[in-house]
Amino acid sequence: MISVQPSLTPQPGGRVRRVANAFALAFVSLITVASFAGSAIRPGDRVAIIGNTLADQLRVHGYFETFLLQLPAEPRVSVRNLGWAGDMLSARDRPTNFQTEESVLIAHQTDVIIACFGLGESFAGTAGLPAFRTALKAFVDSHRGRKYNGKTEVRLILVSPIAYENLGTLTPEHERRNRELADYTAAMEQVATGQELPFVNLFQPTREIMADASAPKLTTNGIHLNAYGYWAVGRMLTAGVATIPPPWALRIDASALRATGDGVTIMQVEPVAGGVRFSVQEQRPPTLAPPLKGPIHAALQPLRDTLAVANLAPGEYLLTIDGQPVLTATDDRWAAGIAVDTSPRHREAETFRQAVNDKNQQFVYGWKALNQVHIVGERKSSPSGQALPAEVIAFKRLADEQDEALLRRPVPLALTHTWQLTPATRPSSRP
């Protein structure tokens, strides 16, 4: 049996507890034994993410932040992502006159910092490990006692690099790189344990799922995650810092007209037109769908909302929700269980993620203005250069307004929808 450790979460008294479950369970139940109040991220936290390209691209894809905003506890968290591609602990260069990180942390009234480092540093190999430990301890010390929210000491969460993916001839040294990354992950864990900090180990679970050569790739070049990779790692990272409710699981017996559900309440199961119809009342938001068609890693399949319908007569069946077609499959596939994350409610969840991404884009325009020639260069005194400060302020205001809108945006629950499976009249689609 293979086990994974997507996180170390703090326990009362500052001790660090390793959380591990069977790999076959993917990551859906890795920390469900802990209450949200005991998690590294707490309701209402104002979170800042800093670090390398992994952190930077969390902002671009938005899965991690959306997963956090979907957590059931209120109030919701507020996130600002200060990740910068290529950042290392000892190399965090910024343009001339760029605002300090401290000023942004104070402006956000930051309660907790999620720090992603270790990838760039790992290229120094074994010889670089002592310097990495020293730099990481210095980083922790630099935030020790700081009260960016004006009230309480900021909390730190350390996040390891992901594994190095084998892409054949594109990554000829993946075995050596993974040995180095394992060493740097272990060093980061040692520092976290010594400093009594939460630690999220992304290296081990990503290395395990990358071993499935038949599954879709998680990265574009062995190092940088693609959209699917950020969906998967976003879920892992969320499981490392908070308690994630399991996804929807609907189970129907079309013959006995019985049903059970996780995340939903199923009512009024009845036969209809050679199939079955039932009402579904949602108790939790739908889970974000992976951003690709076709199969995903078998170990990640339990992260998806699913419907299983047993004892259908042989044939193909169309699932509709409130009359809208969702997907078609054969009776044996329905009996085995199928992911149902293309429903109207799942499309609403994707729209919410896009709103998160838009907020983050407005923040970047205000925080990391791209046209330096108008800020400190030769066009600083031009009309466009003189107008830029007001534009930057406007972008910051837009980001704050959109953030507040996201925090207030209701998550419609206890909604009841009519689900129905009836014999299909078209070829089955393969979700």
Spell out what each predicted region is:
Residues 46-59, 85-90:
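Catalytic nucleophile-elbow at a beta strand-turn-alpha helix junction centered on a G-D-S/GDSL motif
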Residues 5, 17, 27-28, 387-388, ...:
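Compositionally biased, low-complexity segments enriched in small residues
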Residues 1-18:
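N-terminal secretory signal peptides that target proteins for export/translocation
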Residues 41-43, 62-80, 87-430:
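Alpha-helical cap/lid subdomain in secreted, periplasmic
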Residues 22-34:
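Bacterial N-terminal signal peptides
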Residues 36-39:
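Boundary at the C-terminal end of the N-terminal hydrophobic targeting segment
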Residues 3, 7, 29, 428-429:
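Serine residues within intrinsically disordered or low-complexity segments
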Residues 17-22, 430:
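Intrinsically disordered, low-complexity, compositionally biased regions/tails
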